């Protein structure tokens, strides 16, 4: 009997050493938080935060690390998270286009290799699963330039995401500042078994994603303001898909324009265009825009990017930190992940980087009050 109790205690101590627990109180007499990226809601005062140190990322003032504070509450139908992470700059410049004498050029640094680290929006991601994983390792990722023996290598040379078996539910939320994120949009992606590559992917001409499955609705809600190019293709002039109806108003909406990647963007600036603010490219309209003009590289294709979503959020940056508030339904069907006690979470910070994100080993185990 004593030996059995000692064994249970040892297992519990071992698990506690390998994971953090986020206690999520139930809202009974307090209203659910308003999703606005601001902190004063009474609901958040009920939630005890945990701090998750993340590292091995890109930029972030040259440090490559960011501490992420997580709080959460639930009301029996929805769970509400508040993520606050360190980021010295508000980065909204997402692959902007600048007009030169020979035409329009996409500002980038390795975007053709899926490894943009300069002209990219800030992002944040959270992975959730109900698998009892305490060290993600081979369950979600293979590293190196050729991570999977019978599949193409990665253009970035830094590995692929996947699942270790078919039918495993792994859901990845991704908030993207200029691709609908500041309008309430959060992508809901998934990891699965590695997909079969296309001929172009096998030849190393275009990106191979392994088992990463992007949100199927994303392409109808936002996109780049230029056609995708193969490796090396962004070094030549590329016409925008759309030009601003009023280029001066669009330029003014960018705020103070500083094309130094490590310089943050001003509050209220918008580095994206909507359909209502733009028209399909034409040489006549192009001729009215002077050399030196800068236009957004991100297009918002839908009036409300967060429409009919079962996950939504709002974010705000200030004093070197982003705060993102997220609401997600608790129930879900495969391939989504129902959220409950023992759901595990990992988070990642992207500072104006496409794929070069921070990471951490110990999962956050969720524990919901009944």
Predicted ranges, named:
Residues 1-13:
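Hydrophobic membrane-insertion alpha-helices, especially the h-region
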Residues 23-56, 66-71:
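Mature N-terminal segment immediately following signal peptide/propeptide cleavage
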Residues 64-72, 77-79, 90, 333, ...:
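N-terminal onset of structured domains
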